[in-house]
RNA sequence: GUCCCCAUCGUCUAGCUGGCCUAGGACACCACCCUUUCAAGGUGGCGACACGGGUUCGAAUCCCGUUGGGGACGCCA
């Protein structure tokens, strides 16, 4: 049994797409489960659309997700010698030939075939020529692969079983351009061969490329690898997921406050399941994931479920883990956690009440920055006649507490409620608005403990003064 | 147009080795409980086997057809 070797082979024409990330995830999990090797290859033969920025975005996305690779990244543009060698092998064996057709001729051919309601395909004009034809000759000929004309090819797929394609449906695909550079279907075969890839896991939009590639493997004298074509991810309109459906870049989800493990959890469940279990850790997934259990049908991306999973992972994580991911969001808001309560402690109070890190950062600002104003509705509802006396009472009691902890603070609040003959909410809510500026915060005792005695006393006094000046 | 893939609640899914399915779970939505707030949690509700035919004592499950959806048909990947 040879070692399993898989690969992720993105084209650097943009960011790391959600769909690509899911493909990478399935390959990565399959590899890790079986103790294999995960190869990263950058397919950049499209010189016009590939950019270094896109390469960096892909590498950054992979790193953020934690999808580490064992080999590479290999760049296809650095392997042209290898492709040339294999091209020459096919030419020498008569398995490939030069095609002198002009682009104009091919375009006309395609248009005529479509007018006849036929499948557009190369008509084989140069297939058996010894040299250039007498007319309509391209300046630089391309190289085409000599596809068998009869019979069929079977794709054995780990997810779909055997899928059969008639050779008469295929045509002689271009494997090298006029400038000599190879095209995708050729490079992918050569690379997977030379990199010893044993399992190709990719989107099922490539299922129809596979019969051509199997012919190429066989022409080069090799057995094809195992294939698993995983279903697409669709947008809400049922089409392939794209920008018009919202965020589709992995790093965009990072920026919107998602944890990498939450996104991975969501993506793995979009097509794979393990009974009714919904929440998985990455280590757990490595143990459980089985490529043969991936579903056949495409799934629709649903941000609502992803948000819930993010909430589940936030709640279950160690506070220091969340604190590390939260720090950059506070920095973006001009906040230095060193100037206030320990961020880990803040996270502990907020973990059950935020679906994203963006939300958690926004809701935690008041710990580090005195609110400049009170929410109008919250103030109107909770700052009433009599509130100033309650706040000043609490302020005084807070100042005299022997120790500043949640239990002592809770005692002050319940004592004040008794002293003023009101329910606890009539004390807690004004305190909440006073220190946070809003009607929402963690439990008031924990909130005030974190804020500190000095800052609490100052904010409560300030609010009492505001009430005297603005209420009644 | 040709070929390939696919079809269970609004979304993700369990179930597909016929009987255990008056099809279960999660998310979302609605209601109630808990509760100083927001959440979390608990309980309940709403909600699906695309349609037709066949095989069978019996079909979500097997077969055929229709319908609908996705993909490929680039000198992109």
From Swiss-Prot:
A motif ('KMSKS' region) lies at residues 240-244. Its EC number is 6.1.1.17. ATP binds at residue 243. The keyword Disulfide bond does not apply. A motif ('HIGH' region) lies at residues 10-20. InterPro entries: aa-tRNA-synth_I_cd-bd (IPR045462), aa-tRNA-synth_I_codon-bd_sub2 (IPR020751), aa-tRNA-synth_I_CS (IPR001412), aa_tRNA-synth_I_cd-bd_sf (IPR008925), Glu-tRNA-ligase_bac/mito (IPR004527), Glu/Gln-tRNA-synth (IPR000924), Glu/Gln-tRNA-synth_Ib_cat-dom (IPR020058), GluQ/Sye (IPR049940). CDD domains: GluRS_core (cd00808). It catalyses: tRNA(Glu) + L-glutamate + ATP = L-glutamyl-tRNA(Glu) + AMP + diphosphate. One of its GO terms (biological process) is glutamyl-tRNA aminoacylation. Keywords: Aminoacyl-tRNA synthetase, ATP-binding, Cytoplasm, Ligase, Metal-binding, Nucleotide-binding, Protein biosynthesis, Zinc. Residues 112-137 are annotated as: Disordered. Gene3D superfamilies: 1.10.10.350, HUPs. It holds the Pfam family tRNA-synt_1c. GO terms for molecular function: ATP binding; glutamate-tRNA ligase activity; tRNA binding; zinc ion binding. Monomer. Belongs to the class-I aminoacyl-tRNA synthetase family. Glutamate--tRNA ligase type 1 subfamily. This is Glutamate--tRNA ligase 2. It comes from Halorhodospira halophila (strain DSM 244 / SL1) (Ectothiorhodospira halophila (strain DSM 244 / SL1)). The lineage of its organism: Bacteria, Pseudomonadati, Pseudomonadota, Gammaproteobacteria, Chromatiales. The gene is gltX2.
């Amino acid at each position: 049994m040879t070692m399993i070797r898989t690969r992720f082979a993105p084209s650097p024409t943009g960011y790391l797409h959600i769909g690509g990330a899911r493909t990478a995830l399935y390959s990565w999990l399959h590899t890790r489960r079986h103790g294999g090797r995960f190869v990263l290859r950058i397919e950049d033969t499209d010189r016009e659309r590939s950019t270094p920025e896109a390469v960096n975005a892909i590498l950054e996305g992979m790193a953020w997700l934690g999808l580490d690779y064992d080999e590479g990244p290999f760049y296809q543009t650095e392997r042209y010698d290898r492709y040339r060698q294999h091209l020459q092998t096919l030419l020498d064996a008569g398995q490939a030939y030069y095609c002198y057709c002009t682009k104009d001729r091919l375009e006309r051919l395609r248009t005529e075939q479509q007018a006849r309601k036929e499948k557009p395909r190369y008509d084989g004009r140069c297939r058996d020529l010894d040299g250039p034809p007498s007319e309509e000759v391209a300046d630089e000929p391309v190289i085409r692969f000599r596809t068998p004309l009869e019979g069929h090819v079977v794709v054995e797929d780990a997810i779909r079983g055997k899928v059969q394609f008639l050779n008469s449906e295929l045509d002689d695909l271009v494997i090298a351009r006029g400038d000599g550079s190879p095209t995708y279907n050729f490079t992918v075969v050569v690379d997977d061969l030379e990199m010893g890839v044993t399992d190709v896991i990719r989107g099922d939009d490539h299922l129809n490329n596979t019969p051509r590639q199997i012919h190429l493997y066989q022409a080069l004298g090799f057995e094809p690898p195992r294939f698993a074509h995983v279903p697409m991810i669709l947008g809400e309109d049922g089409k392939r997921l794209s920008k018009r459906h919202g965020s589709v870049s992995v790093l965009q989800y990072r920026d919107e406050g998602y944890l990498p493990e939450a996104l991975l959890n969501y993506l793995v469940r979009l097509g794979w399941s393990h009974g009714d279990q919904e929440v998985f850790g990455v280590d757990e997934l490595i143990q459980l994931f089985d490529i043969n259990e991936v579903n056949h049908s495409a799934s629709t991306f649903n941000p609502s479920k992803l948000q819930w999973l993010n909430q589940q992972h936030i709640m279950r994580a160690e506070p220091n883990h969340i604190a590390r991911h939260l720090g950059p969001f506070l920095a973006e808001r001009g906040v230095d956690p060193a100037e206030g309560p320990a961020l880990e402690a803040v996270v502990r109070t907020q973990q059950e009440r935020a679906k994203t890190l963006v939300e958690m950062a926004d809701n935690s600002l008041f710990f580090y920055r005195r609110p400049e104003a009170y929410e109008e509705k919250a103030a109107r509802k909770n700052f009433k006649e009599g509130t100033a006396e309650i706040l000043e009472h609490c302020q005084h009691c807070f100042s005299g507490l022997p120790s500043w902890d949640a239990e002592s603070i809770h005692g002050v609040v319940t004592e004040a409620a008794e002293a003023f003959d009101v329910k606890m909410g009539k004390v807690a809510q004004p305190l909440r608005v006073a220190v946070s500026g809003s009607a929402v915060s963690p439990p008031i005792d924990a909130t005030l403990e974190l804020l500190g005695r000095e800052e609490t006393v100052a904010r409560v006094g300030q609010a009492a003064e505001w009430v005297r000046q603005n209420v009644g």
